[in-house]
């Protein structure tokens, strides 16, 4: 029984790019407004990742008009069209909730040099 559930969940999973907390990403999401369907872009920094197989999620934070906006996305959701990694950040923590209290230059993160 458990193998059957695992097999079905594995079929539902998407191939996603590798990203970590501190990375700046652009997430394109399908939005339905009335009878129309369009793509909406949400660009920000990943502050948390929750790894739970098919139920995995990640939190993206951006500053919009001086206000912090956070959005939680389910990784394998059908409404996600694409995830693009714009910049790789170098952090030593898995959850970057401390960035909520910081503004401006204090909220910057060093760039990870990949070799």
From Swiss-Prot:
It comes from the Bacteria. Pfam families: Ribosomal_L19. SUPFAM superfamilies: Translation proteins SH3-like domain. GO terms for molecular function: structural constituent of ribosome. InterPro entries: Ribosomal_bL19, Ribosomal_bL19_sf, Translation_prot_SH3-like_sf. Keywords: Ribonucleoprotein, Ribosomal protein. One of its GO terms (cellular component) is cytosolic large ribosomal subunit. GO terms for biological process: translation. This protein is located at the 30S-50S ribosomal subunit interface and may play a role in the structure and function of the aminoacyl-tRNA binding site. PANTHER family: LARGE RIBOSOMAL SUBUNIT PROTEIN BL19M (PTHR15680:SF9), RIBOSOMAL PROTEIN L19 (PTHR15680). NCBIfam families: rplS_bact. Belongs to the bacterial ribosomal protein bL19 family. This is Large ribosomal subunit protein bL19. The gene is rplS.
